[in-house]
């Protein structure tokens, strides 16, 4: 994502340990005296995206100025979870292991590119500890594009499928979406739309993140210059502390302590019809 610094300390090419290496470490964990039978997170920052995105990447390196998944998946992308399923099964098969969880890092857009549902079904059935954390970040497609994220309809498609498979498995599980306020491009109107989306879905986030710049990222360039370095166009930036407070409050509109801020934001946006 454009606001993420992971590529700077892990590299742009996704690299993974072998199944044998992960299993060896998991086995060491099972031999610890306080091990209770649970392996709590199998997968790196991209969890299910374990290897290079395409054959070209393996020989020529990553593409300049092109993302593998956003705004739309590259036609050369190879989306295959079969090796990841093999890894999960290998860890599950270890003596003393009761359950293997995937806590976060799932790339839901990559999952939807896989023509097979095998991993999706296995994830829902075997590897969610009540809640799965994913990162749609926003619902405004204009903001999402500046973030380097897929359109919101991709998350909605994932969300629908996740809950459908959960019901088919006879389980009660939830999604915890990571959300961000005040990213470059996000206006008060954008935050109001996100609040309406949360209300529609009946979701009240316990935590939200207000954007802050991290060195070297495209989003940081937008924040300091007001220009998108990827196309040279001007970008609105919420730098005023009070406006950032308003945007953040809208994402947690249901909290009594945010009431006055939410009312002020709605008045500024001409949406007094939403004041309750």
Residue ranges and their predicted role:
Residues 1-18:
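Canonical Radical SAM [4Fe-4S] cluster-binding loop centered on the CxxxCxxC motif
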Residues 15-28:
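Conserved S-adenosyl-L-methionine
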Residues 22, 134, 208, 270:
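Conserved, mostly hydrophobic/aromatic
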Residues 27-176, 180-184:
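Conserved SAM/AdoMet-binding glycine-rich loop
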Residues 43-45, 212-217:
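Short, solvent-exposed turn/loop segments enriched in Gly/Ser/Thr/Pro and often Arg
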Residues 118-119, 183-200:
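Catalytic cores of alpha/beta
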Residues 203-214:
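Glycine-rich phosphate-binding active-site loops on the catalytic face of alpha/beta enzymes
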Residues 216-276:
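Radical SAM enzyme core and accessory elements
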């Amino acid at each position: 994502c454009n606001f993420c610094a992971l590529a700077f300390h892990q590299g742009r090419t996704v690299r993974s340990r072998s199944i044998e290496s992960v299993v060896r470490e998991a086995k060491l964990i099972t031999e610890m005296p306080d091990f209770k039978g649970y392996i709590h997170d199998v997968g790196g920052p991209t969890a299910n995206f374990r290897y290079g995105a395409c054959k070209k990447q393996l020989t020529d390196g990553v593409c300049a100025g092109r993302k593998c998944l956003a705004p739309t998946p590259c036609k050369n992308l190879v989306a295959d979870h079969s090796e990841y399923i093999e890894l999960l099964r290998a860890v599950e098969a270890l003596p003393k292991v009761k359950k293997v969880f995937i806590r976060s890092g799932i790339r839901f857009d990559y999952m939807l590119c896989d023509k097979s549902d095998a991993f999706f079904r296995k994830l829902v059935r075997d590897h969610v500890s009540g809640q799965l954390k994913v990162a749609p970040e926003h619902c405004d497609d204009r903001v999402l594009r500046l973030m380097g994220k897929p359109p919101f309809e991709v998350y909605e498609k994932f969300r629908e499928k996740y809950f459908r498979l959960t019901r088919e498995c006879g389980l009660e599980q939830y999604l915890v979406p990571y959300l961000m306020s005040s990213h470059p491009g996000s206006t008060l109107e954008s935050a109001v739309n996100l609040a309406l989306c949360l209300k529609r879905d009946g979701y009240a986030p316990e935590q939200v993140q207000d954007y802050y710049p991290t060195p070297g990222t495209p989003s940081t360039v937008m924040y300091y210059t007001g220009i998108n370095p990827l196309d040279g166009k001007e970008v609105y930036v919420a730098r005023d502390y009070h406006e950032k407070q308003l945007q953040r409050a809208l994402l947690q509109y249901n909290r009594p302590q945010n009431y006055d801020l939410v009312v002020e934001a709605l008045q500024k946006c001409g949406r007094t019809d939403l004041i309750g």
